[in-house]
C-alpha cells in the first residue's frame, strides 16, 4: 500500500513496528484488567451491603467505595450491561447469579491473600489494605501456591 507525500512523490506506507503493536495490545489488556478489577470491587461491595443492611443503594455504594454518586451510578449501569446486577431507578441494586458468583470469588481471593500475608507476619490492618491491590493481580497459579503454603503451616 502506498501514499502520496507532500512533495507529490508516491512512497510505500510504513508499517508500525512490532514493538508498537505489542504496546498497544498491552494497553488494551490493561484497560480490560482494570474494568474487571472495578467490576469485582463493585459486586463485592454490593454483596457486603446486602449482607449487612439488607439492601444496596447507589448512595451507599458510592460512600463505601469513596466515589461520587455519578461514578457509582455509571458503574452500576455498566454492571447491568454485563449481566452482573439488576436495578431500577430509585430502587435497590441486586446481584444476579453471575454477580453473586463473582462477588464470592472476589471475597474468597481477598480472604486468601489476607491470610497469606498475615501468615508471613504482616499486621492484619496492613494485610487488609495490601490485599485490596494484590487480589486483582495474582494468577490462579500463585493463589494455589498460597493455599499450599498455608496448608503446610497448618490451621
Protein language model annotation of sequence segments:
Residues 1-19, 129-155:
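C-terminal regulatory/oligomerization modules of transcriptional regulators
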Residues 91-110:
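Basic, amphipathic "hinge/linker" alpha-helix immediately C-terminal to the N-terminal HTH DNA-binding motif
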Residues 56-93:
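Canonical helix-turn-helix DNA-binding module
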Residues 29-67:
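N-terminal helix-turn-helix DNA-binding core of bacterial DNA-binding proteins
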Residues 64, 102, 119:
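Residues within the alpha-helical elements of helix-turn-helix
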Residues 38-41, 57, 98, 109, ...:
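N-terminal positioning helix adjacent to the helix-turn-helix/winged-helix DNA-binding module
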Residues 106-141:
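Arg/Lys-rich, alpha-helical DNA-contact motif
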Amino acid at each position: 500500500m502506498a501514499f502520496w507525500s507532500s512533495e507529490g512523490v508516491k512512497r510505500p506506507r510504513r508499517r508500525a513496528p512490532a514493538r508498537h503493536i505489542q504496546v498497544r495490545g498491552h494497553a488494551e489488556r490493561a484497560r480490560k484488567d482494570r474494568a474487571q478489577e472495578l467490576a469485582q470491587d463493585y459486586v463485592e461491595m454490593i454483596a457486603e451491603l446486602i449482607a449487612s443492611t439488607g439492601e444496596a443503594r447507589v448512595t451507599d455504594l458510592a460512600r463505601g467505595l469513596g466515589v461520587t454518586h455519578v461514578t457509582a451510578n455509571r458503574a452500576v449501569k455498566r454492571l447491568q450491561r454485563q449481566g452482573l446486577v439488576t436495578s431500577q431507578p430509585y430502587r435497590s441494586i441486586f446481584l444476579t447469579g453471575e454477580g453473586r458468583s463473582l462477588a464470592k470469588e472476589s471475597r474468597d481471593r481477598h480472604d486468601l491473600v489476607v491470610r497469606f500475608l498475615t501468615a508471613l507476619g504482616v499486621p492484619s490492618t496492613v494485610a487488609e489494605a495490601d490485599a485490596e491491590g494484590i487480589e486483582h493481580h495474582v494468577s490462579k497459579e500463585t493463589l494455589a501456591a498460597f493455599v499450599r503454603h498455608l496448608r503446610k503451616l497448618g490451621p
